[in-house]
A protein has these predicted regions:
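Active-site metal-binding loops of divalent metal-dependent hydrolases
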Residues: 18, 135, 164
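Glycine-rich phosphate/adenosyl-contacting loop at the front of the ribokinase-like
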Residues: 2-77
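Alpha-helical segments flanking ligand/cofactor-binding loops in enzyme cores
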Residues: 43, 69, 151, 182, ...
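A short, histidine- and acid-enriched strand-loop-helix "catalytic/donor-clamping" loop
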Residues: 164-170
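Conserved phosphate/ATP/ADP-binding segment of small-molecule kinases
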Residues: 156, 170-229
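Conserved N-terminal subdomain of the carbohydrate kinase-like
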Residues: 51-133
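Anion (oxyanion) recognition and catalysis
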Residues: 46, 72, 151-155, 185
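Short beta-strand/loop segments at the ligand-binding rim of alpha/beta enzyme cores
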Residues: 157-164
């Protein structure tokens, strides 16, 4: 059995949603797949030989057990992944259009990940990283927990990577999304967002003008599809 220590200085903490994606397989069946941007990052770090740990909640249900087991089997530390008996695991129906573009329908709202509390947070150490996204800001209590985690790891001497990954349909009040996400961006050291997300958050179409509205991060990466980063 793998032995974990939360004091490892180069640990990557990943906070947010661990999702079961339902992907069409033919006309009558859906394939159950592990998903969620934060969960994917946690697995990616582990596969590259790094030490990653997941902070979040899934339901105490079959999908939650599937996600917890999948992350653990990939070498992710799941001691801070809580199986919540009161709420269901986030489940997303994924559809592809004729051009291969994906669309997402969130089947459980609010899902278990939205009920993470500050009590669920670990103690961060200097040199560690926290990666999170805006789904962990969509509603309370996870919003306060996420902002507290970002502040705590920076106070401890760690760093924050933030991927907005905007999903307005998850927010109880979508009008809160731009100001809350901008608050998180200001706390981050590294931010990765798409050009469309930058335009939405800044209200500006021009890339350079949009970037000029961002202050705080040391590095901002903007993805532009086929045009690159």
């Amino acid at each position: 059995m793998q032995q974990w220590s939360s004091k490892v200085t180069n640990r990557v903490w990943v906070m947010g949603d661990a999702v079961v994606d339902l992907i069409p397989e033919g006309e009558l069946h859906y394939l159950r797949c592990p998903g969620g941007a934060p969960a994917n990052v946690a697995v990616g770090v582990a596969r590259l030989g790094g030490e990653s740990a997941f902070i979040g909640r899934v339901g105490a249900d079959p999908f939650g057990r599937f996600m917890a087991g999948t992350l653990a089997s990939e070498g992710v530390d799941t001691r801070h992944l809580i199986q919540d008996p009161a709420h269901r695991t986030s489940t997303v129906l994924v559809e592809l259009d004729a051009e291969g573009e994906r669309s997402f329908t969130f089947m459980v709202r609010p899902s278990a990940d939205q009920f993470l509390t500050p009590v669920d947070l670990p103690v961060f150490q200097a040199g560690q990283w926290l990666l999170t996204c805006s789904i962990a800001l969509a509603n309370e209590p996870v919003r306060s927990s996420c902002l507290q985690a970002m502040a705590a790891i920076k106070a401890a001497g760690g760093r924050v990577c933030f991927d907005p990954n905007l999903r307005p349909e998850v927010w109880g009040n979508p009008a809160e999304m731009p100001p809350v996400v901008r608050e998180a961006i200001a706390q981050a050291d590294v931010v990765k967002l798409s050009l469309e997300e930058l335009q939405l958050l800044s209200g500006l179409d021009d890339l350079a003008a949009g970037l000029a509205t961002i202050s705080g991060p040391a590095l901002v990466l903007v993805t532009r599809g086929a045009a690159g980063v």
